[in-house]
Amino acid sequence: GIISLILQIGNIISIWVSHSIQTGSQNHTGICNQRIITYENSTWVNQTYVNISNTNVVAGKDTTSMTLAGNSSLCPIRGWAIYSKDNSIRIGSKGDVFVIREP
């Protein structure tokens, strides 16, 4: 009981410290204001990586941050999905798309 609680608190603290070390004090708000969208796919084929990169220029698109229904802003998304142990894409009930990568 109490040991499990202490281990979980230690796990959350270590994830927070790791995230703080990786990001530092960087602010990534400029990512949402891009007019160029790059789709990149790295696939393992015959012991080598094949990189496929498609670049699209979004013309005439409004770059302001958009708020969806339910008062959830589309960008930026911050935080950790602590209980997700796999690489996955989750689609929320309001249409939000979350890409979760295993650390």
UniProtKB/Swiss-Prot annotation:
Ligand binding (substrate): R101
Subcellular localization(s) per the UniProt record: Virion membrane; Host apical cell membrane
UniProt-recorded Gene Ontology molecular function terms: exo-alpha-sialidase activity; metal ion binding
Highest taxon listed in the record's lineage: Viruses
Topological type in the membrane: Single-pass type II membrane protein
Catalysed reactions listed for this entry: Hydrolysis of alpha-(2->3)-, alpha-(2->6)-, alpha-(2->8)- glycosidic linkages of terminal sialic acid residues in oligosaccharides, glycoproteins, glycolipids, colominic acid and synthetic substrates
Keywords: Calcium, Glycoprotein, Glycosidase, Host cell membrane, Host membrane, Hydrolase, Membrane, Metal-binding, Signal-anchor, Transmembrane, Transmembrane helix, Virion
Disulfide-linked positions: none
Notes on how activity is controlled: Inhibited by the neuraminidase inhibitors zanamivir (Relenza) and oseltamivir (Tamiflu). These drugs interfere with the release of progeny virus from infected cells and are effective against all influenza strains. Resistance to neuraminidase inhibitors is quite rare.
Post-translational modification note: N-glycosylated.
Major location (coarse): virion
Glycosylation sites (chain numbering): N27, N41, N46, N51, N71
InterPro entries listed in its UniProt record: Sialidase_sf
Role played: Catalyzes the removal of terminal sialic acid residues from viral and cellular glycoconjugates. Cleaves off the terminal sialic acids on the glycosylated HA during virus budding to facilitate virus release. Additionally helps virus spread through the circulation by further removing sialic acids from the cell surface. These cleavages prevent self-aggregation and ensure the efficient spread of the progeny virus from cell to cell. Otherwise, infection would be limited to one round of replication.
UniProt similarity note: Belongs to the glycosyl hydrolase 34 family.
More info: The influenza A genome consist of 8 RNA segments. Genetic variation of hemagglutinin and/or neuraminidase genes results in the emergence of new influenza strains. The mechanism of variation can be the result of point mutations or the result of genetic reassortment between segments of two different strains.
Name of the molecule in the record: Neuraminidase
